[in-house]
Amino acid sequence: MTIFAKDKLIAYGQLMRLDKPIGTLLLLWPTLWALYLAEKAMPTLSVLAIFICGVFLMRSAGCVINDYADRHIDGKVKRTSLRPLSTGRATPREAKWLFIVLVFCSFLLVLCLNLYTIGLSVIAVILAFIYPFMKRYTHLPQFFLGAAFGWSIPMAYGATIEALPLECWLLFIANLSWTVAYDTQYAMVDRDDDLRIGVKSTAILFAQYDNKIIALLQIITLIFLFSVGYLSQLNNRYFIVLAIAGLFFVYQCRLTKNRDRASCFNAFLNNNYFGLTVFIAVLFGI
């Protein structure tokens, strides 16, 4: 079977999670927040297109390297047992090359930006590469994911104003807290399997306090987003819509209350609407 056979292309698409766009959206929203907040207006179409394409490529690359890192354990977890590397529909060598191609394409995009952003992109690649391996060594892999998913924020500021002001880092921390919260919800789905095979996560670390800590992280997210709005001198419409966005967190807390797998997964998916609503808040506020 050639690497371009139909079955292989389908497997590569699944490695890149083309059939599951939620991760791309969760990475896209904070990127858009940062681009619009840095400019206090709509960014140029070229910069916007570069970042949207970059989000897609780097999220895809992250999924590929994640499956490569987990290739020996995915088959032992119900949710991931049918992934291409677990079933043999793609090989580890193919996954490595796919990761390299995706990162290379991302780098070509970054070369269209300024040197400031090119330098920041090196950190983005390092974070994307190391995150999948952290679940073997620490119960805090979600924090590494938060850093990886949030690094588009300083890159967005770098690409537009070539500076990283305080509000950039406050937005980064807000996104970090949000990412840890929603990825803990995601990890709660696999907690029983992860305990059995020895994989670490914040869902395991937080144990019976998981819902309380998720709620705390969500409160921190909102506090920092309010702070960003204040420092960026956004108008009152931003704060009103942001308060509405907070209602999604209340709904998620109700979903995860009983720790049912399906409900935890639905809470995770609901974060897309939170990200979208915050973006609307930014649009109304600038």
UniProtKB/Swiss-Prot annotation:
Domain of life from the UniProt record: Bacteria
GO cellular component, one term: plasma membrane
GO molecular function: 4-hydroxybenzoate polyprenyltransferase activity
Major localization listed first in the record, in broad terms: membrane
Gene Ontology BP term (one): ubiquinone biosynthetic process
EC number: 2.5.1.39
Record-linked InterPro entries: HB_polyprenyltransferase-like, Prenyltransferase, UbiA_prenyltransferase, UbiA_prenylTrfase_CS, UbiA_sf
Pfam families linked: UbiA
Cofactors: Mg(2+)
Annotated keywords: Cell inner membrane, Cell membrane, Magnesium, Membrane, Transferase, Transmembrane, Transmembrane helix, Ubiquinone biosynthesis
Record field: transmembrane: 22-42, 45-65, 98-118, 143-163, 213-233, 238-255, 266-286
Topology class, membrane: Multi-pass membrane protein
Catalytic activity: all-trans-octaprenyl diphosphate + 4-hydroxybenzoate = 4-hydroxy-3-(all-trans-octaprenyl)benzoate + diphosphate
Function: Catalyzes the prenylation of para-hydroxybenzoate (PHB) with an all-trans polyprenyl group. Mediates the second step in the final reaction sequence of ubiquinone-8 (UQ-8) biosynthesis, which is the condensation of the polyisoprenoid side chain with PHB, generating the first membrane-bound Q intermediate 3-octaprenyl-4-hydroxybenzoate.
HAMAP family from the UniProt entry: UbiA
Protein name: 4-hydroxybenzoate octaprenyltransferase
Lineage: Bacteria, Pseudomonadati, Pseudomonadota, Gammaproteobacteria, Pasteurellales
